[in-house]
Amino acid sequence: MSKKKVVIALGHRALGTTMPEQYKATRNTAKAIADLVEAGADVVISHSNAPQVGMIHTAMNEFSKDREDYTQAPMSVCSAMSQGYVGYDLQNAIRAELLKRGVYR
């Protein structure tokens, strides 16, 4: 029998709108994902990054306002940065939860 495949899509604000909210949300999400993994499912995760990309874009543009040697960051760069840090938070939360449960796969 083949494993059950589960796709999890974390929507627009599922991971919060601030860094502390995201930290808490990724830990809570990791628990649910670990439950699925323990049950034998193959899990694929997709996530939105709208609040996070907005925070990064604002921060980068504010930083560059009074500095002639810095240009404003394009939205595509900010999006890549936010995808990386959201993925990093999810990865760390899921890894920690699985290790806590003794799941090593």
Task: Kindly label every feature range from the protein language model.
Residues 1-51, 55-65, 74:
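N-terminal glycine-/serine-/threonine-rich phosphate-binding loop
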Residues 63-105:
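Ligand-binding beta-strand-loop-alpha-helix segment within the catalytic cores
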